[in-house]
């Protein structure tokens, strides 16, 4: 997804479909997540083994809470970004985006909110590996926007009423009409501008860890795509990310 920067918030919103159905008062304070007990997104599945015991391999597998605790995540939830309950059972995809602006995640969150377009991804990954989460895991965020005609069917998603669609504009063209991805996915924004250098190793390692956490949270491996796979007119992720994207889709790490 192309998210334009702080000084071009309106243009940023044109690449996203945004709306909001506040479910709680905005929490503009930031909560640093340092241990599993603090986070509100510790996992959709139980951290305990099934009755009757678990194998040694299962016992050694990190829980979602443990994986989250290893990440430098700051929660900065804004009610304008929450578009209804997604439900863990609907999670199918992780959609990777570039921010297309070289700003901090905290600044980008503020820019999204001030634009009034109600667009956001669940996570933004800074170049230093720190992460801001601005939408809960099981809430719908407007990060994918409209996709190519036929993509709802191709990707097995639909507009089934869970997305409130408030703030969403009309389909931009006859070839870009499908709008189901937001309700079935987690969006990850990567702070990067196309053509302006490599993705730092610390950032890539944070993405690795975030994907592992999401997998553990839902107790399943979501299919990894980037924004231009959903909507062919988009440019993100960049050409510099192509090898990493192939690796993520194949074995879920960047290398």
Question: Where are the language model's segments positioned?
Answer:
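Basic/polar, cationic surfaces and motifs that engage anionic cell-wall
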Residues: 2, 20-37, 43, 49, ...
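Intrinsically disordered, low-complexity segments enriched in serine/threonine/proline/glycine
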Residues: 10, 47-48
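C-terminal motif of bacterial Sec signal peptides marking the signal peptidase cleavage site
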Residues: 15-18
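Sec-dependent N-terminal signal peptides
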Residues: 2-11
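Active-site-adjacent loop/helix surface patches within enzyme catalytic domains
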Residues: 67-86, 93-218
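Compositionally biased, intrinsically disordered low-complexity segments enriched
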Residues: 25-26, 47, 99, 124, ...
